[in-house]
């Protein structure tokens, strides 16, 4: 751990106006005088006596105590998720906008901090990363963040810690409260040299490009691999998997695959299509090239979709309903909740809305090549079997 005298705790929210700017000026001054930037404490609101308190800061509102409300369960399990988490990290703060651009938590932890926890100290290896980078217009400072997972996130670092928990597979999709997360994540120019504020990059574009700082994405959510390297996972295109994606060991995401924040795979899976926010994919499932799974972030959709084990979404297919285990959707067929489906197995060809079949197992959805009608029939035995050579 780093020494107490080498740094103190200050607030994450350095974007709150005049008080925040004065505080940032003090941080810069302290950095020049001591050779180390001051640290951030989001744990208890106890700011070191050497710091003036930031305007708008209140550690108590950072969700340290869980007061009920949000209590999701792990998919397929009666186990309730942990109520709190904490971590030591490094925050990148823009010097031109006084905004926390990102926070990196290399070893996030579930539960309450240990009894000997001191929020004013961070590990020495993280303290060594503190400093300023004038070429990017940022300073890097340590953060100590403790959060309640049932409460909405309250700050940028709080939001980043939740995304790290998901991508480290410490929590499962939909088990952590992410309400309001978009408002806490600024739009950032994520570059090959780290995060930069878009305004700073636009003003200093030539110098940044000459230094090798090329923009890889301009987004609120960064690429997952900038922060986490999942075990036994293949990701062909770094930019197509966001931080906050939950990728179980054995998952392969090919070039045209996309995984948003807070969906995920629960086992070995092939992803060549799009997995929207909140969608959960079972073990042994293949999301074919260009396939699409409807989400709830836009377009009015309300149902969170899940896909069972050993399912196949054919190339360029799509679903707006959940699938049970061992289901197949024919290539090119999009099945929404309102799609009229003709039931062929064990029936007289009655038409029903596909939504009535949501979550049922052992089904094959196909389009009749003569009439164009969408049909569903029962399948026997297991579903698809993945090629083990394609998975770590």
Please provide the spans of the model-predicted regions.
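Short Gly/Pro-enriched loop/turn and capping motifs at secondary-structure junctions
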Residues: 318-320, 334-336, 341, 370-372
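Terminal amphipathic alpha-helical/low-complexity segments used for targeting or macromolecular assembly
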Residues: 2-3, 10, 19-21, 27-29, ...
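A structural motif detector for beta-strand N-caps
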Residues: 233, 239-241, 245-247, 251-253, ...
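A conserved acidic, glycine/proline-rich C-terminal tail/linker
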Residues: 339-355
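Alpha-helix boundary/capping motif
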Residues: 13-14
């Amino acid at each position: 751990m780093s020494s107490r005298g080498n740094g103190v705790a200050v607030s994450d929210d350095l974007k709150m106006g005049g008080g925040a700017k004065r505080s940032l000026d003090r941080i810069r001054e302290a950095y020049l005088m001591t050779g180390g930037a001051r640290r951030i404490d989001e744990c208890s609101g106890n700011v070191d006596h050497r710091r003036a308190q930031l305007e708008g800061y209140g550690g108590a509102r950072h969700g340290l105590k869980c007061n009920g409300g949000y209590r999701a369960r792990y998919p397929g399990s009666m186990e309730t998720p942990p109520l709190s988490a904490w971590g030591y990290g490094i925050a990148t703060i823009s010097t031109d906008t006084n905004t926390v651009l990102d926070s990196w938590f290399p070893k996030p932890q579930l539960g309450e901090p240990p009894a000997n926890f001191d929020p004013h100290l961070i590990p020495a290896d993280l303290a060594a990363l503190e400093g300023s980078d004038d070429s990017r217009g940022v300073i890097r400072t340590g953060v100590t963040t403790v959060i309640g997972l049932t409460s909405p996130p309250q700050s940028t670092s709080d939001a980043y810690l939740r995304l790290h928990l998901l991508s480290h597979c410490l929590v499962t999709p939909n088990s952590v409260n992410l309400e309001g997360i978009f408002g806490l994540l600024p739009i950032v120019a994520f570059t090959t040299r780290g995060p930069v504020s878009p305004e700073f990059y636009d003003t200093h574009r030539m110098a940044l490009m000459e230094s090798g700082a090329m923009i890889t994405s301009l987004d609120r959510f960064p690429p997952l691999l900038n922060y986490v390297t999942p075990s036994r996972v293949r990701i062909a295109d770094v930019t197509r998997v966001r931080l906050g994606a939950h990728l179980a060991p054995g998952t392969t995401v090919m070039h045209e695959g996309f995984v948003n924040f807070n969906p995920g795979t629960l086992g070995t899976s092939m992803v060549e299509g799009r997995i929207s926010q909140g969608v959960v994919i079972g073990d042994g499932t293949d999301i074919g090239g260009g396939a699409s799974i409807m989400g709830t972030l836009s377009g009015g959709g309300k149902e969170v979709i899940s896909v069972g084990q050993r399912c196949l979404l054919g190339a360029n297919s799509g679903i707006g309903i959940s699938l049970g285990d061992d289901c197949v959707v024919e290539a090119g067929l999009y099945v929404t909740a309102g799609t009229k489906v003709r039931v062929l197995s064990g029936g007289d060809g009655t038409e029903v809305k596909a939504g009535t079949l949501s979550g049922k197992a052992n089904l094959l959805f196909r389009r009749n090549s003569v009439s164009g009608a969408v049909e569903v029939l029962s399948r026997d035995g297991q579903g698809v079997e993945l090629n083990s050579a394609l998975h770590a």
